């Protein structure tokens, strides 16, 4: 199968960008992180996480869920060591990572950066945010649409840069026509699942898919909006 991808990041209405991302379509490795601005130097934490995960994933001989969870733990240790430096004591970050090898997808995440999976143009799954708001949804206290507007949505329960480090991993089969979206909360809070799916069905390339979604995002974001980043991935049959 042939993999293609498109990456986009924007500081939004903020004075600097605390999101980081890296992608290598030829190796099937994609990583995105969102540093927490209220916890010291979030941009340092997200860059450390992305660099650590991306380097380890591209060098790994084989990746399964347990291996990827171990790589998240090692990335966490890297950030914890960096916290010993002045001004960086409280830095934290979310992270989401995807590996595509053959007909298998392996992913892991921590925090509220998301991975969406699509098969045949239909939503096949989305990671569960590690947030107070998403816990309310899982507990039946609020609806799924309330997740986008709830006051507690930025209160994260799991992050890198803090112990214990408790990422979650998943695995699934991949077929030609499948697609993936990795994104930070600054993006997904303004573009809903059915819209992501509708734009995917219109797009011929990962870039077109991203551009269609970004048009929706731009129309909805208020002044001073958060950084927003995404990686779109297409899996196609070899020509």
Protein language model features and the residues they cover:
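PP2C/PPM-type serine/threonine phosphatase catalytic domain
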Residues: 1-239
